[in-house]
Amino acid sequence: MVLNIKAPENIVLKPTITVFGVGGAGSNAVNNMISANLQGANFVVANTDAQSLEHSLCTNKIQLGVSTTRGLGAGASPEVGALAAQESESEIRNYLENSNMVFITAGMGGGTGTGSAPVIARIAKELGILTVGVVTKPFHFEGGHRMKTADKGLIELQQFVDTLIVIPNQNLFRIANEQTTFADAFKMADDVLHAGVRGVTDLMIMPGLINLDFADIKAVMSEMGKAMMGTGEASGEDRAIKAAESAISNPLLDHSSMCGARGVLINITGGSDMTLFEVDNAANRIREEVDNLDANIIFGSTFNPELKGMIRVSVVATGIDADKVPTYKPAIAETTNIVPEETYNKAIAQPTQIEEMPDFNSYSTENIEITDSPINQNFIGNEKELGLHANTFNKSEDDSPKPSFLGKIWGSLRASNNQTLERKNVVVSTLDQDNKESDIHDIPAFLRKKRD
């Protein structure tokens, strides 16, 4: 007997983090992260503009909507951007399916980023991937139309992502000066994404005293709502406190306050000279900013030899305004002329009434009395129009007109429904014996037959 002994393959079990850049702004953000040599994440870029895609530093590229846009861009139309992403859905799904966490970065207000980012986020949600959106909003000088387009895109995106981080470009003026170049200003905005991704990856790949696993990170990042993300570095005296205060006061974010946060992720990184008291001071300074006593605060600390003499504090506060997040509801086929359920149930509860057609030949020519039927009470309001006022048949011949022909027929119908016929002084039609000599043609045909 031959035994085949084979050494087990080395299986690496670690979470896969993907940074997905969408449109021109998203592609530029990915380029800056690749240039900064960020470790621990995979990069993918997707664009409708073939020329912009060609100049990307990323090797994983998706040409969105080849048939829809033919590589010419979305023309600032979110609808075209969405159609392009839907056309390339299978390719997007292939790049996402092995990821545990994805950062989707885009610029809101244009066509590709505004329209495609929600589609990509929806695919990630369907795959069960922890999804974080990091997007920018237009400058004020770009006009109200572009800002409204961005706001609509944010509403659409927010229902698919677990956490949303918004960076208004207008906030760049808070940190820029007259010498700041346009490219440097946008790089500052991209650094927010860079710091956030690095803060997550460092917790999982860097050695440290307090390491966090992916389940810890997912518990915080899946709180829904908007998020605040910041990083601060400091050296010298009180470096831990200074780094923490810098992290929690990011001037670029739409929500720079941690008030109302449901989850907080703290990462404190330093060199071998970082002390226990410094870690405690930094963590407590951040905790003071959280007003929610039930907030889920997860803390980690790692070592980085390159940070000797410095301390870096990264914080992510999630679940801000979580109660205002729109709920994603899968689309259903539209139908028309549907009766509301309440109305339908009431109709079913009512008994069906079938009225028989009366036999006009069976009516007697003698005097009859017509009594009201409960079934016909709802028609009383229309009796005046038909010459059937309630007092018409009770008045004497001297003070009231004779019932009209229509009144006679209507009264006969009411009598048939109630099946109650009583004698009274209402004359339908009689032939007086004294008028036998009247012209025979003055008598209705059906009465002539009865007479004969």
Swiss-Prot record:
> What CDD domains does the entry give?
FtsZ_type1
Instruction: Could you list this entry's UniProt keywords, alphabetically sorted.
Output: Cell cycle, Cell division, Cytoplasm, GTP-binding, Nucleotide-binding, Septation
> Where in or outside the cell is it found?
Cytoplasm
- Biased composition range(s): Basic and acidic residues: 433-442
Looking at the keywords, is Lyase present?
A: no
Which residues of this UniProt protein bind GTP?
24-28, 111-113, 142, 146, 190
Return one GO MF term.
GTPase activity
Q: Where is this region: Disordered?
A: 432-452
What biological-process GO terms show up in the record? division septum assembly; FtsZ-dependent cytokinesis; protein polymerization
Gene3D superfamilies from the xrefs?
Answer: Tubulin/FtsZ, C-terminal domain (3.30.1330.20), Tubulin/FtsZ, GTPase domain (3.40.50.1440)
Extract the HAMAP family matched here: FtsZ
Subunit: Homodimer. Polymerizes to form a dynamic ring structure in a strictly GTP-dependent manner. Interacts directly with several other division proteins.
Q: What does this protein do?
A: Essential cell division protein that forms a contractile ring structure (Z ring) at the future cell division site. The regulation of the ring assembly controls the timing and the location of cell division. One of the functions of the FtsZ ring is to recruit other cell division proteins to the septum to produce a new cell wall between the dividing cells. Binds GTP and shows GTPase activity.
Q: What is this protein called?
A: Cell division protein FtsZ
Gene for this chain: ftsZ
